[in-house]
């Protein structure tokens, strides 16, 4: 084959024209210390706080400490192959994850990578893990209810869409159970749920996944998990990943519910990272910015205004206390950030009242504006009645003879407590809750034994669902207890009282 000189010259000219003299600057550093999930690097002169770093073995780290002579980075992995002298490259990016509709029904890790063995997830978009919270003008006040399906919560500590309500209590008092019941109750209500498990046993997370799958709730739920054996960095990032996934749905005009289970473990992971990075310790050895750790996460929960599509993100953070001490550092921090708290007591739990909510110190600061009118009609005085009952019960232990009015009040209170008892994974609709409280408030249980109240309520709900289904339809559509609905309810209660008496 003979080459012509003009052909060669034209190829050379074309190459010269297409040549782009672009200098690509890559910022490299060298590891001089590594261990305990922390690496110290020198030579990385142009690096941002929070920037992702790539190590020789493919491990990703986050630059957290920018010091005069070196950079302190936390590793998203075990980093066992990183050695002293290894090269590190600054990527110029901050942590971001893929988001999209494909995440529904999936279990992912702190970097939104699937870990359920169902293959890759198709994503529509990416979002920064650390996004700014919506501003004041972007929000509107909480005004729509988010029903948990638990009578005690929906009646006395109501939650609205866009609210942040803390669930706080000792270990094994039913905190996760309340959160899971709330997810189950969102079925058919167009609410997308994100459950974030931080520092939990893999078996506990598997149990939650199975419960949601069996009850058809996994279809509208995303589970983000950083198990107890995960690196502290991944446990620290997991809640932000959950919030980012929920934000995607919130900004596409949907309602979302995020559960952080639990933030005590995230704070402990952050404390571990900070101490290893030699940041100065503060109260309980937590770093000085641990309040900011939680405030910037929980402030992302919001009810957006109409111009932004009216989406919402409701947050239910969980915090574990030691011996019921709510005055410890992390509990007081999160209480001050949130819009109320549901306090669970070990003593109440052990006495057989479940959910074990201590009504006296539980509060919802903004939820009453979102409570359905039907619930307000029947539950207005419920909290006061229960508080008076608790006071009288404590006093009656020392008094030998009580007058008839006090005895009646104690009897009514004991029956109201029975109404609030509820089995796990069995949330109730608004109409069923209203019927239960209405019957208790109006003395229909006064002639029943305390232990007969719950069997009676189960039978009454079945009767209302079958023979008197119009009652449920009216309450569901009008959201109020109309005179017609009240008449039907009275008729059903009276009829079932006779039937229940005959059964005895």
UniProtKB/Swiss-Prot annotation:
The record marks 362 as: Required for activity. It is an enzyme of class 7 (translocase). Belongs to the ATPase alpha/beta chains family. The keyword Ion transport applies. Keywords: ATP synthesis, ATP-binding, CF(1), Chloroplast, Hydrogen ion transport, Ion transport, Membrane, Nucleotide-binding, Plastid, Thylakoid, Translocase, Transport. ATP binds at residues 169-176. It is found in: Plastid, Chloroplast thylakoid membrane. Produces ATP from ADP in the presence of a proton gradient across the membrane. The alpha chain is a regulatory subunit. This is ATP synthase subunit alpha, chloroplastic. CDD domains: ATP-synt_F1_alpha_C, ATP-synt_F1_alpha_N, F1-ATPase_alpha_CD. One of its GO terms (cellular component) is chloroplast thylakoid membrane. Its EC number is 7.1.2.2. Its main location: plastid. GO terms for molecular function: ADP binding; ATP binding; proton-transporting ATP synthase activity, rotational mechanism. It holds the Pfam family ATP-synt_ab_N. It catalyses: ATP + H2O + 4 H(+)(in) = ADP + phosphate + 5 H(+)(out). Gene3D superfamilies: 2.40.30.20, ATP synthase alpha/beta chain, C-terminal domain, P-loop containing nucleotide triphosphate hydrolases. It is a peripheral membrane protein.
């Amino acid at each position: 084959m003979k080459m012509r000189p003009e052909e060669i010259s034209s190829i050379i000219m074309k190459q010269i024209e297409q040549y782009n003299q672009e200098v690509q600057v890559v910022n490299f550093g060298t590891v001089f210390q590594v261990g305990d999930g922390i690496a110290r690097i020198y030579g990385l002169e142009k690096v941002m706080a929070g920037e992702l770093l790539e190590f020789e073995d493919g491990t990703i780290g986050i630059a957290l400490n920018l010091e005069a002579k070196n950079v302190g980075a936390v590793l998203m992995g075990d980093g066992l192959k990183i050695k002293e002298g290894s090269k590190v490259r600054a990527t110029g990016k901050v942590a971001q994850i893929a988001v999209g509709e494909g995440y529904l029904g999936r279990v992912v890790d702190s970097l939104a990578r699937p870990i359920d063995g169902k293959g890759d997830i198709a994503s529509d978009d990416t979002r920064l893990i650390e996004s700014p919270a919506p501003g004041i003008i972007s929000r509107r006040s909480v005004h729509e209810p988010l029903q948990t399906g638990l009578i005690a919560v929906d009646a006395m500590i109501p939650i609205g869409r866009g609210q942040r309500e803390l669930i706080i209590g000792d270990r094994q008092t039913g905190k996760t159970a309340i959160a899971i019941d709330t997810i189950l109750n969102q079925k058919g209500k167009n609410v997308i749920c994100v459950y974030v498990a931080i520092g939990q046993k893999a078996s506990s997370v598997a149990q939650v996944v199975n419960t949601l799958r069996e009850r058809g709730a996994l279809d509208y739920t995303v589970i983000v998990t950083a198990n107890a054996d995960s690196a502290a960095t991944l446990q620290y990032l997991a809640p932000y990943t959950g919030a980012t996934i929920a934000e995607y749905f919130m900004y596409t005009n949907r309602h979302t519910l995020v559960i952080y289970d639990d933030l005590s473990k995230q704070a402990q992971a952050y404390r571990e990272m900070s101490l290893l990075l030699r940041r100065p310790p503060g109260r309980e050895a937590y770093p000085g910015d641990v309040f900011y750790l939680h405030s910037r996460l929980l402030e992302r929960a919001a009810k957006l205004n109409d111009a932004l599509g009216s989406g919402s993100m409701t947050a239910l953070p969980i915090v574990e206390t030691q011996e019921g001490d709510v005055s410890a550092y992390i509990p007081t921090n999160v209480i001050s950030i949130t819009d109320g708290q549901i306090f669970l007591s070990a003593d109440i739990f052990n006495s057989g009242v479940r959910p074990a909510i201590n009504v006296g110190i539980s509060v919802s600061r903004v939820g009453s504006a979102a409570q359905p009118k039907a619930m307000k009609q029947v539950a207005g005085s419920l909290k006061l009645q229960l508080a008076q009952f608790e006071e009288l019960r404590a006093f009656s232990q020392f008094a030998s003879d009580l007058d008839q009015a006090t005895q009646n009040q104690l009897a009514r209170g004991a029956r109201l407590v029975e109404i609030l008892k509820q089995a796990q994974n069995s949330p109730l609709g608004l109409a069923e809750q209203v019927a239960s409280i209405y019957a208790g408030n109006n003395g229909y249980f006064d002639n029943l034994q305390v232990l007969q109240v719950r069997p009676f309520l189960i039978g009454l709900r079945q009767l209302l669902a079958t023979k008197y289904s119009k009652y449920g339809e009216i309450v569901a559509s009008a959201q109020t207890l109309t005179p017609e609905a009240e008449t039907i309810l009275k008729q059903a209660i009276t009829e079932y009282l006779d039937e229940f008496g005959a059964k005895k």
